Amino acid sequence: MLLMIPGPTEIDERVIRAMARQMIDHRSEEFRTLMKSIVENAKKIFETKSDVFVLTASGTGGVEAAASNLTMPGDRVLVPMCGLFGERMADAFEAYGGHVIRAKLENGQGPNPEAVKKLLDEHGHVDIVAFPYNETSTGIISQNVKEIARICHERGALVVVDAVTALGGVRVAVDEAGIDFCVSGPQKCLAAPPGVALVSVGERAWEKIERKKTRPPYFDMVKYKHFLERWETPFTPAVTLFWALDEALKIILEYGYEKWLRRHAAGAAGLYAGLRTYELEFYAAKGFESPIVSAMHIPPGMTDVAIREAMKKQYGILISGGLAHYKGKMFRIANIGLISREKIVNTIFALGKVLNSLGKSVDVETAVERAEKEFDRNFPA
């Protein structure tokens, strides 16, 4: 089965083998060596000199770590939302006492400097601005996160970014962008199994975290910082998943991080070229189309279940439907991890055949040619 869903993604045989070993003591020198390797390599992907931690939790747990460590009583938290994961960020900050401003962005737009500036002007002082870099549920990506962060810092607000699907698929560049607390996960563009979260914590975030009198017992980042000084975790980690993550990061860096990003860009170019040939309508507005996951409205007379089931049963390709209140309104195709020309082309071919069988007349041959051409143009052999 070919996984073209927005996570979990397929993993390399090396990553699978890395998990097939006997357990070790998480207070041993062997584990400390493993932890050091993960952190040092993860910093290269985050492009940060800040502290990086691995939490035994999902990406959502990483977001909760940010909310629980940064939110002071009465803090005003602005969350520009364009989908479900923005809503979940808002829920997390609200659960920890934040006064959350849920700013729904309209017309298929994601967070962008103009929108964030307008919201800050409208709502006055805020302490934290939090948003997903890439909104997986609607296929919408943020624009110019660096400028968003500059505007927020100018107003005295910290910037928290959910980069769970973005890291490894696009250049996040935490330090250059000015992200204070960045959360990611391994099961998307890093091509590792789910079950841990990666977080980077910058100086501005630490200043606030260390002032906080009550921190969560499990997600206490100060505690994690103290343990990281000796390359350990405060609590028993998912050692097997640490091995997998370590191997996945090594694969990316051996392949070449720039090349890894270019391959994702080529996959996006090929995928969108094919999808546009089919005249599908995207949830994202022009300029906000996610290169990581494409979300399309369902063509008239079809259902997402019919499209997905035909893709799975007839072609062995798994794609996604909508989540929560988007269920039944869209279908989604991801471009993450071990993406290749063959996977993109096969997906475009299969989708075209399925659309034709369900009553939408499309030119499969032209779509495949355009997908191949755009992939090759962006990632020459």
Residue ranges of each PLM-predicted region?
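Conserved beta-loop-alpha segment that forms the PLP phosphate-binding cup at the N-terminus of a helix
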Residues: 49-78, 82, 86-91
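Conserved active-site segment immediately N-terminal to the catalytic lysine
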Residues: 175-187
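Active-site C-terminal subdomain of aminotransferase-like
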Residues: 10-11, 187-273, 277, 381
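Active-site phosphate-binding strand-loop segment of PLP-dependent enzymes
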Residues: 111-168, 181, 189
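A glycine-/small-polar-enriched, mobile loop at the entrance of the PLP active site in fold-type I
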Residues: 1-56, 60
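PLP-dependent enzyme catalytic core of the Aspartate aminotransferase-like
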Residues: 1, 325, 329-381
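Conserved PLP-binding catalytic core of the aspartate aminotransferase-like
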Residues: 281-314
